Structure formats: C-alpha cells, structure tokens
Design a protein with these regions (language model features):
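Short, amphipathic alpha-helical "recognition" segments used to contact nucleic acids or chromatin
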Residues: 1-13, 51-58
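Short, flexible loop/turn motifs enriched in small residues
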Residues: 13-16, 144-150
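Basic, flexible linker segments flanking DNA-binding modules
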Residues: 20, 27-130, 228, 285-295
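RNase H-like polynucleotidyl transferase catalytic core
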Residues: 101-107, 195-199, 213-233, 247-255, ...
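RNase H-like two-metal-ion nuclease catalytic core shared by retroviral integrases
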Residues: 111, 197-199, 205-209, 221-244, ...
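Two-metal-ion RNase H-like nuclease active-site motif
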Residues: 122, 133-142
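Active-site beta-loop-alpha junctions of metal-dependent nucleic acid enzymes
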Residues: 143, 147, 165-188, 204
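C-terminal domain-tail junction helix/linker
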Residues: 213-215, 239-301
Length: 301
C-alpha cells in the first residue's frame, strides 16, 4: 500500500522493483493490489451479517469465533456465503469483534464439616441423554449499591437451560429452597432427576433436604469440599453470565439490588434460555434444543 500511494501521487523516484525488494513485497503482489484496491471487500456482506447479529442482543458482542460461526449457520442470512470457521475468525478480527474473557469468578459457598453429605452421583459427567435427567445448582454473588445480591440457579445438563432461578440479599438455605420450588413449579417432571451441588451449608441443611425429598429428587454432592472441578459446569455458567452481562458493561456498584434483579432475570429467562447461541448445544439456544428433543419423540410415536 505504501508503494501504491507513493506512485499514485508521483512523489516517488526510482524503480518500483527496488522498493518492492526493500519492503519485501513481490512485484506480483503489488500489481494485484493495484488491480483490486478499489474493489469492494469480498467479505463485506459477511461482516455486515456479523454486526447485525451483535446488535440483536446486547450480550451478543461477547461471541467468539465458534459461537459467531454457529449463529451464522443457524440464521443463514440471505445473500451471505458462510465460509469456514477460520475465515469467520479472520473477518471478526478485521472488524474488531475479537472478544476475550477477562475474569473468572470464585465459588462462595462454604462446607459444613459436621453435616451429613450425599454421594457424588455425577462424578464430573455433566452430559445427559434427555431433559430433566441431570441438573446442577450453585450460588453466586454480585455487589450492588445497597448491598450484595445472591443469585441461585438450577441448570439442566441436557441443554444448559435455567430451570429455576431465585435471588435474595442473603445466601441462606431458604434461597436454595426457593430455587428448587421455582424449578419444580415450572417442571413437575423434575421428580426423579439428579440434582448436583457443592457441599455448602445451604445444600446440607435440613430445610433443603426436606424439599429435595418432597419433590422426589436425588441429591448429589461434590466428592469433597474444595474440589471445584466436581461442579465445574455450574462455575462455568456463572463465569459466562458475568462476562457476558456484567464485566465491562455495567458498574453493578452503582445499581440497586432491585435493578440487578430485573437485569439478571431478563438475561437468564429471556436471553439465555431462548436466544443465546450455546456451543455445547451445537449452536442451538437451550429451549430450541429442548423443543427439538420433544418433537423427535412425537415423530417417533
């Protein structure tokens, strides 16, 4: 490009071949550039489609190359040729869509060494063949202007859908029970499912165990306190949630607890469950994968 600019305005002296050699540019590449420099960028329609995807939801700008590629495959924008994943990545780099995660949240629950523990029924296998077979649950905290907000959720291992969600300004056992109540109210067929958690006092409490037994759910716990990998999938969900919705987007310390509740509820129930591209689901949002599963059962019947 330097050589082309100089030759166009006539301020360069000497042979072009000399400058090509000095700048380590082949004469063939230089001539090709001259022929194509005024041509439209061949990936412009693809770039426009990517930017449109980012504008659909405020959290879509956190898509990396895999989820962006999956989003393009799912939406199939009219008139846009979808190249391979590596080309998608290069175009993303070109237009500045090169999001990189910055932080990892830490767990906040503490184990009660004296409380009775349940067996580890998951054993780090977070896969499931059908909905409501295996579920995971955990709590995370967020600082607000008027205190801390604790968020408790139950995720389905089959499609990573949020089945139950509850929030409060304390992280007592009642919060986890409320999450379980909400999940069972929405999904009565949760009976018989495995629900895995860490060994926090909330999950070993009598209040929580009574609710587990009432709903006919099988309780599973980490094999030992401090082994974060035993509930790694849930920790990963919190990490993605905070990276996508909070970090670099909202200063939660300037927001009230009630404002955060509204923001988080909308993120999980509306965006996460129904519109967010999920790589673990082959690019399908959780509820889309769930609907496809039940549709396949009807077709088989």
């Amino acid at each position: 490009m330097f050589i082309a600019i100089k030759t166009d305005d006539g301020r360069i002296k000497g042979k072009i071949s000399f400058y090509c050699r000095v700048l380590h540019v082949s004469r063939q590449a230089f001539n090709k550039y001259l022929k194509t420099k005024d041509s439209p960028w061949k990936y412009q329609s693809l770039a426009d489609a990517m930017l449109d995807i980012c504008k659909e939801d405020e959290c879509n700008d956190t898509y990396g190359r895999i989820r962006m590629y999956q989003a393009l495959q799912l939406k199939q924008p009219e008139g846009v040729h979808i190249p391979g994943e590596r080309t998608v990545y290069r175009v993303m780099e070109e237009i500045g869509l090169n999001y990189k995660p910055k932080r990892k949240p830490n767990g906040i629950t503490k184990a009660d060494k004296e409380a009775r523990k349940s067996d580890d029924l998951i054993k780090r296998d977070f896969t499931a063949k059908k909905p409501l077979e295996k579920c995971i649950t955990d709590i995370t905290e967020i600082k607000a202007s008027d205190g801390k907000l604790y968020v408790s959720a139950i995720f389905d291992c089959y499609d990573l859908a949020v089945l139950g969600l509850a929030m409060d300004t304390n992280m007592k056992a009642a919060l986890c029970k409320q999450t379980l109540d909400n999940a069972y109210r929405a999904y009565p067929t949760l009976r018989g499912a495995i629900l895995h958690s860490d060994r926090g006092t909330q999950y070993t409490s009598e209040l929580y165990r009574k609710a587990i037994n009432k709903y006919g759910i099988l309780q599973s716990m980490n094999s030992a306190s401090g082994r974060c990998h035993d509930n790694a999938r849930c920790e990963s969900m919190w990490a993605r949630f905070k990276e996508e919705l909070l970090y670099g987007r909202y200063d939660t310390t300037t927001m009230t607890v009630e404002q955060l509740k509204t923001l988080i509820w909308r993120y999980f129930i509306s965006y996460w469950n129904n519109r967010r591209i999920c790589s673990a689901n082959g690019g399908l949002p959780p509820m889309v994968k769930r609907q496809q599963y039940y549709a396949s059962l009807q077709e088989a019947a």
